[in-house]
Structures are given as C-alpha cells and as structure tokens.
Amino acid sequence: DILSGLVGSEMCIRDRVCTFPGWEAFRDESTVYTGSWTVGGPGGIKSPFTGKKTIRLVDLMHHRGGLVPDPQYPNATVAGELYLQNLDDISNRTDVIDRICRTPLMYAPHTERAYSDVDYMILGLIVEQVVGKRLDEYLQEGVYRRLGLERTGFRPLDIRTPPDLIAATELNGNTRDGNVGFGTRPDGSPVFIRTQTIRGQVQDEKAFYTMSGVSGHAGLFSTADDLGVLLQLMSNEGMYQGREYFPADVQRRFLTPDGDSATYGLGWRTNGYYYFHGGPSKAAFGHTGWTGTITMVDPIRDIQIVLLTNMRHSPVVEPPNEFAAGAFPLAHYVGLISRVYSALAEDGRVTDVDAPLPERAASSPTSSHRFRVVPRRRSSR
C-alpha cells in the first residue's frame, strides 16, 4: 500500500529536506533577507539564524524547523524577492520550491516550537515527489475514493460541487475588509488580490495564490459526514469496513508525543487533558483550523467530534486578523468540547475514568459516521 509505505518508514521521516531531488538549495547559502524579512525588519527576524541543511521531515511535522511562520509569498510588499503568485499552473512546483529554499529562518532549527505553514507546504510537495502525482490526485485515488468520500478534496469547483453547498469564508476576499493589499508590480499596477466573498476557493493566501489551491497546509474541503469516516478510520487505527489503509503502528507513531512536549504528535495535537481538557480521555487527539474548524478523536470513549464553521465570514473588527464571529461561543473550541462531554456525562454516557484502548476492530458499521443530535434526557425535577 502506497500510503503505508509513504509514512511507515522511520528512515524516511528522519531524512533531511535538502537530500530530496530539487531541494538541494534548501541551505543557508540560498537564504535571502528581503521585504519584511530583513534582519531587524517588521517580520520579526532578529538574527540571521543558520542550520537549514539540518532540518528533517520529522522536524517539520513537529513544527521545530524554525522557518518563518507566514512568509506571505503572494504579497509583493511583504515577500520582496520571495514574491510568487501562481494561480493556474498546479503542475509548476519549481517556483514555489525555489522561494521556500530561499526563505529565512525565524529561529535556529530544533530550538523553538513555532507553527509554520511552510512546514506542511514542504511536506505536501515532497509527498508529490515521492509518489509521482499531485497531492490532490494522490489522495483522491489512494484514500478518498476508496473510502467512498464524495465531498472531500481540493478545488471543489473543479469537480462541479455546487457553490451553494460550500460555506463562504471572508466577506471581502483577502483584503480584511479593505485593510490589506498585496503591493504593486514594477509597472505600478496593483498585485492581484481577491476582493469578493470567498466561496469554493481556499481562503489561505499561500494555498490559493502560490500553490494553485492544492497544498499540504491548506485547501482541503469536506463535510461532517466525510470527516466522520476519516475520524472513524483514525479511531480504529487504520481499519475501515474490513480494509486496512495503514498499519496501527504507523498511527501510534504519529500520536506519540514529542520528547519535550506532551501535546505535540506528528501533525496532531495530543494529550486530551491538556489540549482538549474538560472531558476527553488522555488518548484524545485532534486539530483546529483557522477558518473555524476542529476535529477530535477520543478512541477510548469512541467519540469523534467534527465542528465546521465559517467563523471568518464576518466583519473585521480589529484589523487585520480579528473577526466579529470570534466573540461567538462556537469560536472557543476547547470550551465547546468540554460542553459536549458535560452533556454526555449528565446523560450518563461517559465517565471520568480512563480505560485501556479498545481492541482494534476489523470493520466499522457503515452508519458509524452519520451524525445526529441526541436530545438530552429530561430531568425529573
């Protein structure tokens, strides 16, 4: 199985980025300090850190590579020489690899844990190189189609998903209600930026403008039903309806906390009592999304939670990143998870006692991923 082979090798995830074909320039000598990313500039780079050639895939998965969190490649003012917009040619990955190789470090590698979109941009690009296919095609053929997922994928408008079935995100494109622009071209014309309500396109700027909508860090569209299947697959350690999609030990490796943090696995946030406190077992894991989403799996209690909101589809109240919907109760993910567990506990459906992980089931019922609201038991008082 390609998926198992891709993620199942300890040697693979410990390979250095610069050892992959096309990434030879991922070294300090290629770094440029430009735009907001000059040393001492507004981007926050305090020193010309070195050590790019030591960065491994596992460092990126743990967000310990030290790369600039958001280089803003499509913004000419911020990115400077790193500027890149590539809206239409998904097959052209050479230019974005070039920009990433020249992107400076914010911290010395392996010294700080800082979330960086670039980490998973790199991982997605390397997956494409390893499997010899675009990321969207590989996942569609190797995972989503096999699982029967009909509403999961990148660039949904390309597969004729009706726009009215897709939640809108920002009201005025990526302008933050007119507070943000992408600068000007050498001829004085403005750099392109979306100004209309975003619907059916990825909101993330780097994913849309630089990666043509297909990236390892953003751009995936789905539904609660489809995500329920994927979470059931994770809850069942790689098995779904009698088929193994990846070995259980691969998943356990991804959920093993990093040495100096109990809350970071490989791509997942782990340790339910810390990250999803207020009910989930210690085995719970999940992730949040900036646009207003969260997924959580509690394998001990066999609970999966999917929350898909379009929180950013609201006016900007404190430019450039605060939105009015941020004050809504649903915007506070951790509190919401706690409330779900409190309701289940009141109904007698969960307890506070952690139990061993259940035996890995050979299959899952086809209805296991369907979601419905369960009325709370009425009190006799």
Model-based region annotation:
Residues 127, 234, 299, 308-311:
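Short beta-strand segments enriched in hydrophobic/aromatic residues
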Residues 218, 293-294:
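Beta-propeller and closely related beta-sheet repeat lectin domains
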Residues 17-284:
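Short, surface-exposed loop or secondary-structure junction motifs
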Residues 289-291:
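Short, small/polar residue-rich loop motifs at catalytic or cofactor-binding pockets
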Residues 1-15:
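Single conserved hydrophobic/aromatic residue that forms the stacking wall/gate
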Residues 267, 294-296:
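Short, surface-exposed charged micro-motifs
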Residues 295, 302-310, 315-319:
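Short, well-ordered beta-strand elements
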Residues 236, 250, 259-260, 273, ...:
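Short, gly/Ser/Thr-rich active-site loops of penicillin-recognizing serine hydrolases
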